[in-house]
């Protein structure tokens, strides 16, 4: 046993997760900020990869600004969502708009303020639930999905 433990191990490292952030930006009238992605045409929350040198709150404010032109005040973490297929863990924060003007970016073809019903109509289940979770006030929620469908907790 000691001989085995003293030998160098050539085990492969387990795959690592990527951490992303997204903002549920809620206007006073209850409408929610969403983007239509340029790469695949889907409606989602503004967000992206968290950079190594920033806090999650700083990262979500940066991503919302870059993708929509809207400045935000970050309120609270409302959910943690793991994409089991791609190894992405998304931290989702409820935010309030604090300035700026809506605009598209290289990552979006449309920026819109949607009602909760429009969110359910336009977004895939795994993205719509993030907005709906942020509105229910019972978070933070922890959920997993395969990129298309939620995976029941268990």
From Swiss-Prot:
A motif (Nudix box) lies at residues 48-69. PROSITE patterns: NUDIX, NUDIX_BOX. Residues 15-136 form the Nudix hydrolase domain. InterPro entries: Nudix_hydrolase (IPR020476), NUDIX_hydrolase-like_dom_sf (IPR015797), NUDIX_hydrolase_CS (IPR020084), NUDIX_hydrolase_dom (IPR000086). Mg(2+) binds at residues 48, 63, 66-67. Transmembrane segments: none annotated. Belongs to the Nudix hydrolase family. This is MutT-like protein.
């Amino acid at each position: 046993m000691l001989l085995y433990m003293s030998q160098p191990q050539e085990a492969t490292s387990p795959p690592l997760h990527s951490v992303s952030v997204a903002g549920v930006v809620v206007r006073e009238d209850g409408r929610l900020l969403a983007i239509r992605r340029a790469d695949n045409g889907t409606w989602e929350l503004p967000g992206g990869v968290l950079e190594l040198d920033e806090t999650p709150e700083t990262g979500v404010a940066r991503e919302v600004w870059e993708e929509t032109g809207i400045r935000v005040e970050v309120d609270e973490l409302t959910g943690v969502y793991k994409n089991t297929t791609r190894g992405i863990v998304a931290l989702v924060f409820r935010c309030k708009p604090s300035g700026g003007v809506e605009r598209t970016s290289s990552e979006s073809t449309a920026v819109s303020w949607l009602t909760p019903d429009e969110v359910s109509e336009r977004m895939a289940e795994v993205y719509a639930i993030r907005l709906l979770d942020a509105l229910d006030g019972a978070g933070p929620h922890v959920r997993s999905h395969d990129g298309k469908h939620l995976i029941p907790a268990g």
